[in-house]
Amino acid sequence: DRRMLDVGTGTGLIALMLAQRSAAWITAVDIDVECATQAAENFAASPWADRLDAVSVAVQRYDPVEKFDLIVSNPPYYVDSLLSPDEGRNTARHAAGLPFGELAAAVVRLLSPGGRFALVLPPVEMQRFRSAALGRLYPVRWTEVCSTPRRGVRRILAEFCTTPVPAPEPARLIIELGGPDSYTEDYR
């Protein structure tokens, strides 16, 4: 059976999407107890409750019995911005609780042989992650996401493995053409 891990699950949305599209066993971890509790409630209310598990733990300390075939993360990424007085908001939005080097180390430790790691980050933060993961994780897919043809890259969707491979040719995904209801075919 395939096993998947969602790091920094928040409310569990990405884990639920994985469950909807696969028959895998999915574990979702979040350092924030309230987030993990909310994710567990959302999982229990879903048709896939028997394959979803939410755990409140920092991924750096997570020690499961088995490794994962796919690890996904849309992690907190603000590094240089001001912190909020709300500690929970800081945990959800700032990389201080999960530095990219520690994320890369956790992924390498938790990934099964031949497994993949999918990551979503803005461009500057993705470059910071790649620097932190240098020599440990290698990109196999790379998609630059733009909201419209005239706007710059807003996010990068990247997939990594632990085996050195040639760098992939970047793909570009444009979400809309600029008018109302003008989503591109690729985005739909």
Q: Where are the language model's segments positioned?
A:
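Conserved SAM/SAH cofactor-binding pocket of Class I
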Residues: 1-73, 79-87
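Short beta->alpha junction loops/turns
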Residues: 32, 122-123, 180
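Short, well-ordered secondary-structure micro-motifs
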Residues: 65-66, 83, 129-131, 155
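Mobile active-site "lid"/loop adjacent to the S-adenosyl-L-methionine
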Residues: 75-102, 106-109
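Conserved Class I SAM-dependent methyltransferase catalytic core
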Residues: 98-153
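SAM/dcSAM-binding transferase cores
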Residues: 152-188
